[in-house]
């Protein structure tokens, strides 16, 4: 039966919609979608006749167009029969002036423009290289004569004449900001040409379109910033003061600074940037003075946004600040934030990745009113970011950005930008044989053949890792199931534990249950516990953090627990993530029995581990795998359901598993046809996986030794023969030891030894049997009456999912 949405679900959905309501485009008749124009004239836009009638426009009217980033331009409107009602046709020049693309939405309204007295235009430098003759006579006069073209300050227009295309920029108009160039308008063109770089910089200003994966946060910021700056009367009408400050916090690379720049560009507000450390000065009182000047500048140019980057550098907690300067700066910032005139139209945005190190007084209401967490994006957010970064890239047909987004767990915006860059560089490397560094130019054919492929992205993903985990030893291992011989039941159990929640989350949602997130491997040393953890992390494409128990312990009080917290925080940031505790018994010993433990550090560490495993913090997709060969000394609280609830015994391999281990170890090794691996497996009873691998390594070493000795002998014989002038035989040039033979294994078996004694095995068996008995009902529990026919119970025991005997070594 499908689950019925509850009243609570409906309420949550409504709240979500309200939270992002500000982002929804309001439908208005004058908002139209941009389409490609058939007309190449820079001053013309086309509408359907019906739309012109609806908006009260006539053919030849001047209109003002508003695009992205508060950009405006003016044009003449014409009717076109082939233009749909909801579209507006314009050429590339007009689109660039509006900072818009095909498919974007622009608004159009009638404009009452005056004839201009003066217009000042300047050419772009790279379009007039090598030009001789008068620019005015050749280009500008024919372009403007009798055309009555409307122009807007800041616009760029192109003029074609004398087999050349020249770009001009409108620097100034009188009256400003737009006018019509009439026959008596004076056109000035004196001055240095405008540099292309400066123009490109202006074109590449960031806007809301360049932000991905922060939809909800962007809605909050627009509420807090755009509403007070654009419509302060809203707050006045409802009787509250508009917010003054926003604190953006989150890991490095999530886009905090980018958001602030985009808001400034889109609102058209004055933007003043303070980089935290820059205002510090060695002169007494100068640092505070710099802050005061910044606030005064913003108030003078309101509406304004004051952005303080890395605020933790200038506003640390006063009780922890070492110098007097920091304390004075914090006090100055507090008074300035309070002293901002209520309707001064100045919003302060601050960014930090260490919100807890900022002075508490700054974080109260009335200073930084709202704290917005710019977190690590999910798969949908990552796809948005990838689309933004690849919009100007040439991509091959096989590139599946959705798949790339799904596999880049834990990546922030900066990591994804680096990934795209690395993939593009790899594509260039592949074409390197066609490129000569000494040449001044590169063939157009080579340039056209460049396209980033999925293979390039795969290569880049192999090299990149989430920045949140750079300092932790995080690797996606390259161990696969084929590297592990035997243990089929254990593999299945692990797949259900880790792969299912990552790959089929909807199934858990359907049955309304949280997946189990912890597993403990126990068993004799050398049976593949660590190898299994690596394989599962690789198979489900999760990040993998390996923690060696003793590494967490330090001599400083409280530092060991902080290390545990940091590790779990990093794992949560890079979810889905497998946290692997090797030698768990070193940090999870039963509490209260630590003899000679200074200050009870080991007990505090285990307490921290327990709260992190099953604490108040939502674990997200963090899976904990512990491995130990001393399960008897581990604290029972760690092994309860909800923490490490799946206890899996990794026994010594049976005969079939030993054969699999031999095959896995020797799968890349040339073997002679008469080598009987079945016989080897039959005669290595009681050997662990590590012991069997060691036998293979020793046989390989013996083969290498024999090969080198024979080569030296043959080389000597060859030299003797050539000295006597005799010819070399064909067979003497062949490889002396082409494969590993029975003799090598017979020799290796002389040195083979068991690393696990019968006594050790008995201990593990007893522990496993104790667990079996503590399971209570075993296979005897049944409901009264007939069992439902929907399916038989799977796997009687909870350990390895097979028969009871599978749990133990026979």
Swiss-Prot record:
One of the record's GO molecular function terms: ATP hydrolysis activity
Biased composition (Basic and acidic residues): 713-727
Chain positions covered by the region annotation Interaction with ufd-2: 805-810
Recorded coiled-coil stretches: none
Subcellular location: Cytoplasm
Positions of ATP 1 binding: 252-258, 353, 389
Family: Belongs to the AAA ATPase family. CDC48 subfamily.
Protein name: Transitional endoplasmic reticulum ATPase homolog 2
Species whose genome carries this gene: Caenorhabditis elegans
């Amino acid at each position: 039966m499908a689950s019925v949405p509850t009243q609570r679900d409906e309420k949550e959905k409504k709240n979500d919609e309200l939270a992002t309501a500000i982002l929804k485009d309001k439908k208005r008749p004058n908002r139209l979608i941009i389409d490609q124009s058939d007309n190449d004239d820079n001053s013309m836009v086309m509408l359907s006749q019906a739309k012109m009638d609806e908006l009260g426009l006539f053919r030849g009217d001047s209109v003002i167009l508003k695009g992205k980033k508060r950009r405006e331009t003016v044009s003449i409107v014409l009717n076109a029969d082939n233009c749909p009602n909801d579209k507006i046709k314009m050429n590339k020049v007009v689109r660039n002036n509006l900072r818009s693309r095909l498919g974007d939405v622009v608004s159009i309204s009638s404009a009452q423009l005056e004839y201009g007295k003066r217009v000042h235009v300047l050419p772009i430098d790279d379009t007039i290289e090598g030009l001789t003759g008068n620019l005015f006579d050749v280009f500008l006069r024919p372009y403007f004569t009798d055309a009555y073209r409307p122009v807007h300050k800041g616009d760029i227009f192109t003029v074609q004449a004398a087999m050349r295309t020249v770009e001009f920029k409108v620097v100034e108009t009188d009256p400003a900001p737009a006018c019509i160039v009439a026959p008596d308008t004076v056109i000035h063109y004196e001055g240095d040409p405008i540099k292309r770089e400066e123009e490109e910089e202006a074109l590449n200003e960031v806007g809301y379109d360049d932000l991905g994966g922060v939809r909800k946060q962007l809605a909050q910021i627009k509420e807090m910033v755009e509403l007070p700056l654009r419509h302060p009367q809203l707050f006045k009408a409802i009787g509250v003061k508009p917010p003054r400050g926003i604190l953006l916090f989150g890991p490095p690379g999530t886009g905090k600074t980018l958001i602030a720049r985009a808001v400034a560009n889109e609102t058209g507000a004055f933007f003043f940037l303070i980089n935290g450390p820059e205002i510090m000065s060695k002169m007494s009182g100068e640092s505070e003075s710099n802050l005061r000047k910044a606030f005064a500048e913003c108030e003078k140019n309101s509406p304004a946004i004051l952005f303080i980057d890395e605020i933790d550098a200038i506003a640390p907690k006063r009780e922890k600040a070492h110098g007097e300067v920091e304390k004075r700066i914090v006090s100055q910032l507090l008074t300035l934030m309070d002293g901002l005139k209520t309707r001064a139209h100045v919003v302060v945005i601050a960014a930090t990745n260490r919100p807890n190190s900022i002075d508490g007084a700054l974080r109260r209401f009335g200073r930084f009113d709202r704290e917005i967490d710019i977190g690590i994006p999910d798969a949908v957010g990552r796809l948005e970011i990838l689309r933004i970064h690849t919009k100007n890239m040439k991509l091959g047909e096989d590139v599946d950005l959705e798949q790339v987004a799904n596999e880049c767990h834990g990546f922030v915006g900066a990591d994804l930008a680096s990934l795209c860059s690395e993939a593009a560089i790899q594509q260039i490397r592949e074409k390197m044989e066609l490129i000569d560094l000494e040449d001044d130019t590169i063939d157009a054919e080579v340039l056209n053949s460049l396209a980033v492929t999925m293979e390039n992205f795969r290569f880049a993903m192999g090299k990149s890792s989430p920045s949140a985990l750079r300092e932790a030893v995080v690797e996606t291992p390259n161990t696969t199931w084929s590297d592990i011989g035997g243990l089929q039941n254990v593999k299945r159990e692990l797949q259900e534990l880790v792969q299912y929640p990552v790959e089929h989350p909807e199934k858990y949602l359907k049955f309304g249950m949280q997946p189990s997130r912890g597993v403990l491997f126990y068993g004799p040393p050398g049976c593949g516990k660590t190898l299994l953890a690596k394989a599962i992390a690789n198979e489900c494409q999760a990040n993998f953090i390996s923690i060696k128990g003793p590494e967490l312990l330090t001599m400083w009080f409280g530092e060991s627990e902080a290390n545990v917290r940091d590790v779990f925080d990093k794992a949560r940031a890079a979810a889905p993530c497998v946290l692997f505790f090797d030698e768990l018994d070193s940090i999870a010993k039963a509490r209260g029995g630590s003899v000679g433990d200074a200050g009870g550090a080991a007990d505090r560490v285990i307490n921290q581990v327990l709260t992190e495993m099953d604490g108040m913090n939502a674990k997200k997709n963090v899976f904990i795998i512990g491995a130990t060969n001393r399960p008897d000394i581990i604290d029972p609280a760690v092994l309860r359901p909800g923490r490490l609830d799946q206890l899996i015994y990794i026994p010594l391999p049976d005969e079939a598993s030993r054969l699999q281990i031999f095959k896995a170890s020797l799968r890349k090794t040339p073997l002679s046809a008469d080598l009987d691996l079945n016989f080897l497996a039959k005669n290595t009873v009681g050997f662990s996986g590590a012991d069997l691998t060691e036998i293979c390594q020793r046989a390989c070493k013996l083969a290498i030794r024999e090969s080198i000795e024979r080569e030296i002998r043959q080389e000597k014989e060859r030299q003797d023969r050539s000295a006597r002038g005799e010819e070399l035989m064909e067979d003497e040039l062949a490889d002396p030891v082409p494969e590993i033979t029975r003799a090598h294994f017979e020799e290796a078996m002389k040195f083979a030894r068991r690393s696990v004694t019968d006594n050790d095995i008995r201990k593990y068996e007893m522990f496993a049997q104790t667990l079996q008995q503590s399971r209570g009902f075993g296979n005897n529990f049944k409901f009264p009456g007939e069992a439902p026919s929907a399916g038989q119970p799977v796997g009687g025991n909870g350990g390895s999912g097979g028969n009871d005997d599978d749990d133990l070594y026979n």
